[in-house]
UniProtKB/Swiss-Prot annotation:
It catalyses: RNA(n) + a ribonucleoside 5'-triphosphate = RNA(n+1) + diphosphate. Belongs to the RNA polymerase beta' chain family. RpoC2 subfamily. It comes from Guillardia theta. The gene is rpoC2. This is DNA-directed RNA polymerase subunit beta''. The keyword Metal-binding applies. The lineage of its organism: Eukaryota, Cryptophyceae, Pyrenomonadales, Geminigeraceae, Guillardia. Keywords: Chloroplast, DNA-directed RNA polymerase, Metal-binding, Nucleotidyltransferase, Plastid, Transcription, Transferase, Zinc. DNA-dependent RNA polymerase catalyzes the transcription of DNA into RNA using the four ribonucleoside triphosphates as substrates.
Length: 1286
C-alpha cells in the first residue's frame, strides 16, 4: 500500500456537527486519504470503542414506549376519509368514472402516507430528539425512514400478487397493531419480497458471470496510451433531479487537459493530473459545470486500459497499479449490487402516480389571474377534475390577500388545476408538470360492472357503431355520457317457456311468472323413483314364460353360475344379472351339452365356409342347421424348456403314455413334431396318422386338403375322410372327425305388453368361435360349437339397450326372466338458471304405472315471484332468452315536498343531491315515478359515467343482472411492461436488446412541425437546417413527447418508450460519415452510444440508491463497443460480415494506403455482453463460457491460435496469470529477451497475398502476448514505441 508521507499531513479540522453516518464516512475518508490505511484503521477502532462506551453509559435501548405515534395521525386519516367520501359522492352522482375514483383513492392514501411520514419526523425532531428510534434511523446506525414510518406512521397501500394496488390501505402501524384484514393484505407484500429475493440471487449471479467473462482480459498494461480523446463529465440529471453530482463523478479521474480558473486563468489542475477531493472541491467552487477527463471508453491501449485513462484505484485512493485486473473489478462492482435491485415494481393501474409528475403547491393564500391571450387546452385530469394544459411557457400573476402581485413561471405542458380568478390556500396543489422522461403509456381497459339489477337508460351518449373486417359490430362512445341503471328485480327466462303476465300487472309474492312444460317423447308406462328426480318410461317389455331362474342374491359367485331351467328339463347358464345393460345380438345364456366336444386340440375346417362368412359378427360364426365341421386332431404340449431335457425325437412315432419330458406324458399315439427356437423347445405336437412313401400313392390332391381315403389309397375299403399332410419327404395321412350340427330344439314361450313398441326378441343360435383352418393348441378337448340364447332388436338405433330384470314368481323362490327397454326423462330444475333456483317449483301431472302417449304432458316447472311489485318491462332478445323486470317496493323511495314548489316532472332522472322542490334535495339518485300533493315517489337509479372511446356491452333499455358488464372503459396508464426496473433493465441494456416497443428517433437535427392526424396515425415533419423535411408516422399507441416548433438533436426520442441503441448507433454513424472519415465517424458514433449506455445503467442503480463508479460501467461498455462489422473487404483478406476490432481494421487500412490497395469498409456494431464474450479473440475463454462445441469446432476449422492474453485462458491451462505479480514476472522475462527494436511491419495475416514479407521479421512480431502487449498481432501503431518500462 502506498502511504503518502511526501508532504506534511493536514491537521484535523474541528467538525462542529452531529457526527452521524454521513459525517463519519467523510471523517474516515479524510483520515484514509491523508494518513493511509494503518492509521485510518487505528482511528476507526478508537471511534468504535468511543461509540460503545457512551452507548453503554447512556443505556441506549429500545422499548415499545419509544414508538411514539404522532397525535396528528387521527386528523390526517379523518381528512383522507373525508376526501374519499367526497370522491364516492362524485362517483355516485356519475361525475367521475370508476377509473378516476380508483386513481383518486390511491393518490389520496399515498399523499396521506407521505404527509404522515413527514409529521413523524417533525414530531420526533420537536418533541423527542433523543428518542432511540429517531437516533438510530437518522444517524444511519440501523433502520431507515420507511421502516420508522411502518412502526409509528401507517403501513400504507399494498399490492396484490398480480401487482395491482389494493385500494384498501393499511391505516394502522405496527405499534397499534393490524386488524385481520390488514394483516392478510400485508402478507401479500411479504411473500412477494421473499419470492423476489430468491429469483434475484440467481439472476444476479448469472449477470456477474457474464460480466466477468466479457471483461476478464482487461488489465492495466501501460502508463499512458497517449490518446487524443476524452469524455465530458457533468451532473447526471434525470427528471430534473441530480442523480450523480459532478463532484462525485470527478474524484479519482485524470484530467484530459489543463484546467484554468474562469476569472484569472490560474491553473486548477494540470493535464494528466489525478483529481483528489481538494482539486474537485475547487473545480466545483469555481462554478465549472463540465470537465473533460480521460476515460476507459477513449483509451487507445490495445486490449487493455492505461493507468491515466483508468485513474484511481478506488480502494487505495491513488493511481491504479500496472497489472491490475480492472476488468474483473468492474464486473464484480456491477454484479454484486444486483441482488439489491428490485425485480419489478407495483403498478397502480392508473395513468401515472405522483412521483412521475412534479406537483406545484401554492406559496401563500391568494388568487390567480390568467391573461387574455393565454393559449390553453381544457383537459380532464386523472382524478376527473377539469384542468388546463399550457401550450406555451407563461409567467402568470398570482395575488396574495393584500393584493400584491407575484409572477410565477409555468413551463409549456404544465397542467393547472385552478381556473381564472379562483382562490387557493397555501400548500394547495395548483398544478403539476409532467416530467419529460421516457414514460411509456399504453391503452388499458377496465370493465364497468353494474352493482345492481335493472333497466339501462342512455343519456347524452354519442354512440358510433363500428364494424370490423369480420363483420362484427361494436358500439363505441364518441363523447362521454351517463349510463343509468333503473333498479328492479330482473328475471332471465328461457325462450321455450311461456310468460303468464303482461306489462303493468301487479304481482303478489309467489305469483307464477313463467311455466316450462316437460313433454314425453315416447309411448309407454310411467315408472317413478322415490325422489321423483328422474321419470322412467317403459317403452318395450318381453318375459320368458316357460323357464325359471334358480337365484339367490346372497350366494351369487363366479364358480356357481345362475341356471335358467326350461320346462322340458334343458338348462342354460345365464351370463347376466339384474341391472345389466344388454345390446343387440348379445348373449344372455349358454346351453350346456357335450355333443360337439373334442378329446384333444387340432385344426378346424368348415364344409360351407363361404356361406358362414356372411353370417360372421364380432361374437363368432352363426352355424346353420345341418352344417358339417371337420376336425383334424393333434395334441399340443407347450414346453418352453431346453432341448437337452427332451426325452423323444422329432418325426418319430410314439405310443400314448410316452414321457415327453420329465412328468409330462402324451395322451395319444402319433408322430412327433418338435418346434424349437435357439435350443429352446417351444412346443411338442403329436399328430395321429399313417406315413406312406409318396411314390406308393398317386394322389392328385393338394397337401392340406380333406379328401376321401379311396382317392388316395384305391385299395382301401373304408368309407372315411383323411387330411393330407407331409413329414419330411413322405406323405402323412391324418384321420378326420366330422360333426354334423343340428339346431338345439329349445322352445321359447314369450309374453309381451300390448300397445308398446315391438323392439325386443329372444332367439336361440349355434355359434363357433374359431376361423376356418385355425389351429387350436390344446392337450384336452374343447367345445367346437355352443348354443346361445341371444337378444335381437328390431330397431335401427345403434345405441339401443335393454335391461335385465328377475321377476319373482308368486309362492315360489324362483324368478322369471324379463327384458325391458326404458327411456329416462330428466326434470330440468335449472331451466330458469341457478340464480332463480329458490323460486322454481315443479309439479308432476302423471302417476306411477300410468300409460302415456307420445307428446303427453309429464310435468310443469313454474318460476314464481320473489317479492310483490309491478311488472314494468318484458324484453325478448334474439339470443334465445326473455327477460322481465319487476319493480318492487324497496326499489322506490319517497321524498316529502313540504308544500314547496315542485321543480321536477315525471320521468326526470335526478342525481343524488339535486334539488326536487324548494329546499328539498334528493337523498339518492333516481327517476321520478309519481308526483302526489305531499310527496314525490322516485324509483332508485344509479348513474355511471362512461368516458369517450368506451366500448358499450349493452343496448339502451336492456335489462341487466347484478355484476353484468355495462361497458369496457379504455384509459391510458404507464406501461408496466416497458418500464422494466432493476435487474431485468440492467440485463436489457448490457445485452443490447431491442426494446419491445422502441421510441421513434429523429434521423437528423432540426425543427419539429406537427401536421395532420387521423384516428390511427399522426404525421409529424422534421425540418433540418438545409430546409429538407422528413415525415414520421406515429401510431396511436405511441405518444409524442415533443411539442410543435421544438428543436431536436440527432437521434433524440420523439415519442415515448426506450430508444433502440442499435438504431441510435446507425443514425449517428450515417450522419457522421457524410461529414468526416469512416474511422472518425465510427469512433464518434460509438462514443455517443457508450455515453448513453453508461448513463442508463447508472440511472437504474441510482434509482435504488446504489452508488457505482462510472469507470466500472465504462470498462464493460468499452468491451461491448470495441468491434466493427466488415461490409466490403476491399483488397484485404477480410470477409464481409466478419467482426474485427476497430483499431485493428484501421491499422490494416493504413497499411492498404501504403500499398495503394482498396481499404475495407465497415460499420460499428453494438454487441451484448454474451455475444461479446463469444466473439473474443481467445477461443479457450469463449469455449469455457457458452456454446463450447460450436466455438471449438469453428476454432479448429479456422486453425485459430490462442495468444493467452486474458486471465481466464491462463487459469484454464494452469499458467501464471498476467496480472498482479504475474504481470511483472512476464515483464522481466520480456525485458531480458528483448534485444532488438522492432520496426513497423504490416500485418500479413490480414493483408492480401500480393504483399511479400520476410518470414524472419514476421516471427518476431508473433510473440507471447504475456511478455508485452506492444507486439500483439494487430497493434501497428504501437510497434515502433519503446516499452515504457524499459
Amino acid at each position: 500500500m502506498k502511504e503518502k508521507y511526501l508532504f506534511v499531513p493536514p491537521k484535523p479540522k474541528f467538525t462542529n456537527k452531529v457526527i452521524d453516518k454521513k459525517e463519519l464516512k467523510k471523517l474516515m475518508a479524510w483520515a484514509f486519504s491523508n494518513y493511509g490505511t494503518g492509521r485510518a484503521s487505528f482511528m476507526a477502532d478508537k471511534i468504535k470503542d468511543l461509540g460503545f462506551h457512551y452507548a453503554t453509559k447512556a443505556g441506549l435501548s429500545l422499548s415499545v414506549e419509544d414508538l411514539r405515534v404522532p397525535p396528528i395521525k387521527r386528523d390526517l386519516l379523518l381528512q383522507a376519509n373525508r376526501e374519499i367520501q367526497q370522491t364516492e359522492q362524485l362517483y355516485e352522482r356519475g361525475e367521475i368514472t370508476t377509473i378516476e375514483r380508483f386513481q383518486k383513492v390511491i393518490d389520496t392514501w399515498n399523499n396521506t402516507s407521505e404527509q404522515l411520514k413527514d409529521e413523524v419526523i417533525k414530531y420526533f425532531k420537536q418533541n423527542d430528539p433523543l428518542n432511540p428510534i429517531y437516533i438510530m434511523a437518522f444517524s444511519g446506525a440501523r433502520g431507515n425512514i420507511s421502516q420508522v414510518r411502518q412502526l409509528v406512521g401507517m403501513r400504507g397501500l399494498m399490492a396484490d400478487p398480480q401487482g395491482q394496488i389494493i385500494d384498501l390501505p393499511i391505516k394502522s402501524n405496527f405499534r397499534e397493531g393490524l386488524t385481520v384484514t390488514e394483516y392478510l393484505i400485508s402478507s401479500y407484500g411479504a411473500r412477494k419480497g421473499l419470492v423476489d429475493t430468491a429469483l434475484r440471487t440467481a439472476d444476479s449471479g448469472y449477470l456477474t458471470r457474464r460480466l466477468v467473462d466479457v471483461a476478464q482480459d482487461i488489465i492495466i498494461r501501460e502508463i499512458d496510451c497517449g490518446t487524443q480523446r476524452g469524455i465530458v463529465l457533468r451532473d447526471m440529471v434525470d427528471n430534473n433531479q441530480i442523480l450523480v453530482s459532478l463532484k462525485n463523478r470527478l474524484i479519482g479521474r485524470v484530467l484530459f487537459e489543463t484546467l484554468y480558473l474562469p476569472n484569472d486563468a490560474s491553473v486548477i489542475g494540470h493535464i494528466n493530473q489525478d483529481l483528489d477531493h481538494d482539486i474537485t472541491n475547487s473545480i466545483i467552487k469555481c462554478g465549472i459545470k463540465s470537465v473533460i477527463v480521460r476515460s476507459p471508453l477513449t483509451c487507445e491501449a490495445p486490449r487493455s486500459v492505461c493507468q491515466f485513462c483508468y485513474g484511481w484505484n478506488l480502494a487505495h485512493g491513488s493511481l491504479v497499479d500496472l497489472g491490475e485486473a480492472v476488468g474483473i473489478i468492474a464486473a464484480q462492482s456491477i454484479g454484486e449490487p444486483g441482488t439489491q435491485l428490485t425485480m419489478r415494481t407495483f403498478h397502480t393501474g392508473g395513468v401515472f402516480t405522483g412521483e412521475l409528475a412534479e406537483q406545484i403547491r401554492a406559496p401563500f393564500n391568494g388568487i390567480i389571474r390568467y391573461p387574455k391571450n393565454l393559449k390553453i387546452r381544457i383537459i380532464r385530469t386523472r382524478h376527473g377534475n377539469e384542468g388546463v394544459i399550457l401550450d406555451e411557457n407563461y409567467k402568470l400573476n398570482i395575488l396574495n390577500q393584500r393584493g400584491e402581485k407575484t409572477r410565477l413561471e409555468f413551463k409549456q405542458g404544465t397542467t393547472l388545476f385552478i381556473s381564472d380568478n379562483e382562490e387557493f390556500k397555501k400548500g394547495q396543489i395548483i398544478g403539476e408538470t409532467k416530467s419529460r422522461s421516457t414514460l411509456v403509456t399504453e391503452k388499458a381497459t377496465r370493465d364497468l360492472v353494474t352493482e345492481t339489477s335493472g333497466e339501462v337508460i342512455y343519456t347524452n351518449l354519442n354512440i358510433e357503431n363500428k364494424i370490423d373486417r369480420q363483420g362484427n359490430s361494436t358500439l363505441i362512445t364518441n363523447k362521454g355520457g351517463l349510463l343509468w341503471i333503473l333498479k328492479g328485480d330482473v328475471y332471465n327466462i328461457p325462450y321455450n317457456t311461456d310468460i303468464q303476465l303482461k306489462i303493468g300487472d301487479k304481482i303478489a309474492k309467489d305469483t307464477i311468472i313463467s311455466t316450462f312444460k316437460t313433454i314425453s317423447e315416447y309411448n309407454g308406462i310411467v315408472r317413478l323413483n322415490e325422489k321423483n328426480e328422474e321419470i322412467q318410461i317403459l317403452t318395450d317389455f318381453i318375459s320368458l314364460e316357460n323357464a325359471e331362474i334358480e337365484y339367490n342374491e346372497l350366494d351369487v359367485n363366479i364358480e356357481c353360475p345362475i341356471n335358467l331351467r326350461f320346462e322340458d328339463g334343458k338348462i342354460l347358464n345365464l351370463l347376466c344379472v339384474p341391472g345389466n345393460k344388454i345390446t343387440n345380438s348379445q348373449v344372455i345364456g349358454e346351453y350346456i351339452e357335450d355333443n360337439y366336444k373334442t378329446t384333444t386340440g387340432g385344426i378346424i375346417k368348415y364344409k360351407n365356409y363361404a356361406e358362414l362368412k356372411k353370417e360372421k359378427n364380432k361374437k363368432g360364426y352363426e352355424i346353420n342347421d345341418n352344417e358339417v365341421i371337420y376336425w383334424i386332431p393333434e395334441e399340443t404340449h407347450e414346453i418352453n424348456k431346453d432341448l437337452s431335457l427332451l426325452l423323444i425325437k422329432n418325426n418319430t412315432l410314439i405310443n400314448s403314455g410316452t414321457e415327453i419330458i420329465k412328468d409330462v406324458y402324451c395322451l395319444n399315439s402319433g408322430y412327433v413334431e418338435i418346434i424349437q427356437e435357439d435350443e429352446i423347445v417351444k412346443e411338442v405336437i403329436i399328430k395321429p396318422g399313417i406315413i406312406y412313401d409318396s411314390s406308393e400313392l398317386n394322389t392328385k390332391r393338394n397337401i392340406g386338403t380333406i379328401c376321401d381315403i379311396k382317392e388316395v389309397i384305391s385299395t382301401s375299403t373304408e368309407n372315411k375322410q383323411i387330411f393330407l399332410d407331409v413329414i419330411g419327404e413322405k406323405l402323412f395321412l391324418r384321420p378326420v372327425e366330422s360333426y354334423n350340427i343340428k339346431m338345439s330344439h329349445i322352445n321359447l314361450k314369450t309374453k309381451r305388453l300390448t300397445n308398446l313398441e315391438d323392439i325386443l326378441n329372444l332367439k336361440v343360435v349355434n355359434r363357433s368361435l374359431y376361423k376356418d383352418g385355425e389351429k387350436i393348441k390344446s392337450v384336452y378337448g374343447l367345445d367346437l360349437v355352443k348354443t346361445y340364447l341371444i337378444v335381437n332388436f328390431n330397431s335401427n338405433k345403434p345405441y339401443a339397450s335393454a335391461d335385465i330384470e328377475f321377476a319373482p314368481i308368486e309362492n315360489s323362490t324362483k324368478y322369471k326372466l324379463n327384458l325391458t327397454i326404458t327411456e329416462s326423462i330428466q326434470l330440468n330444475y335449472d331451466i330458469f338458471g341457478a340464480i332463480n333456483n329458490e323460486d322454481v317449483k315443479t309439479s308432476l301431472v302423471i302417476k306411477d304405472g300410468q300409460r302415456i302417449k307420445k307428446e303427453d304432458l309429464i310435468a310443469e316447472t313454474h318460476l314464481v315471484a320473489r317479492n310483490k311489485g309491478i311488472l314494468k318491462n318484458i324484453l325478448i332478445s334474439s339470443q334465445s332468452t326473455k327477460k322481465l323486470l319487476i319493480m318492487r317496493e324497496e326499489d322506490t323511495f319517497r321524498v316529502p315536498t313540504n308544500n314547496a314548489t315542485i321543480q321536477v316532472s315525471r320521468g326526470d332522472l335526478v342525481k343524488y343531491g339535486d334539488q326536487l322542490a324548494g329546499s328539498v334535495i334528493a337523498s339518492e339518485s333516481g327517476q321520478v315515478f309519481e308526483i302526489t300533493k305531499n310527496e314525490i315517489i322516485l324509483r332508485k337509479a344509479y348513474p355511471y359515467l362512461v368516458s369517450a372511446g368506451a366500448i358499450l356491452q349493452i343496448k339502451d333499455h336492456e335489462l341487466v343482472q347484478r355484476n353484468d358488464t355495462l361497458a369496457i372503459l379504455v384509459f391510458e396508464r404507464s406501461k408496466t411492461g416497458d418500464i422494466v426496473q432493476g435487474l431485468p433493465r440492467i440485463e436489457e441494456i448490457l445485452e443490447a436488446r431491442k426494446p419491445k416497443e422502441p421510441c421513434k428517433l429523429s434521423q437528423k437535427p432540426g425543427k419539429i412541425n406537427t401536421t395532420n392526424s387521423n384516428d390511427e396515425t399522426e404525421v409529424i415533419q422534421l425540418i433540418d437546417t438545409d430546409g429538407y423535411t422528413t415525415d414520421y408516422i406515429i401510431n396511436n399507441n405511441q405518444k409524442l413527447i415533443i411539442s410543435n416548433g421544438e428543436n431536436v438533436l440527432l437521434a433524440e426520442p420523439l415519442t415515448d418508450g426506450a430508444p433502440n441503441p442499435h438504431e441510435m448507433l446507425n443514425l449517428y454513424f450515417n450522419f457522421y460519415t457524410s461529414i468526416i472519415t469512416l474511422y472518425e465517424s465510427a469512433k464518434l458514433s460509438l462514443q455517443k452510444v457508450q455515453t448513453y449506455l453508461v448513463d442508463e445503467v447508472q440511472k437504474v442503480y441510482q434509482s435504488q440508491n446504489v452508488d457505482i463508479s462510472d469507470k466500472h460501467i465504462e470498462v464493460i461498455v468499452r468491451q461491448m463497443t470495441s468491434k466493427v462489422k466488415v461490409e466490403d473487404g476491399g483488397d484485404t483478406t477480410l470477409l464481409p460480415g466478419e467482426l474485427v476490432e476497430l483499431q485493428q481494421i484501421e491499422n490494416i487500412n493504413e497499411a492498404m494506403m501504403l500499398t495503394k490497395g482498396v481499404p475495407a469498409t465497415y460499420c460499428p456494431i453494438l454487441l451484448g455482453i454474451t455475444k461479446a464474450s463469444l466473439n473474443t479473440d481467445s477461443f479457450i475463454s469463449a469455449a469455457s463460457f457458452q456454446e463450447t462445441t460450436r466455438v471449438l469446432t469453428e476454432a479448429a476449422i479456422e486453425g485459430k491460435a490462442d495468444w493467452l492474453r486474458g486471465l481466464k485462458e491462463n487459469v484454464i491451462i494452469g499458467r501464471l496469470i498476467p496480472a498482479g505479480t504475474g504481470f511483472n514476472a512476464y515483464n522481466e522475462q520480456h525485458k531480458s529477451s528483448k534485444s532488438m527494436k522492432l520496426t513497423g511491419i504490416p500485418d500479413t495475416y490480414y493483408l492480401s497475398s500480393s504483399l511479400e514479407v520476410e518470414d524472419s521479421k514476421l516471427s518476431t512480431i508473433i510473440e507471447d502476448n504475456n511478455l508485452e502487449q506492444y507486439n500483439s498481432i494487430d497493434s501497428f501503431d504501437n510497434i515502433e514505441k519503446e516499452n515504457p518500462n524499459n
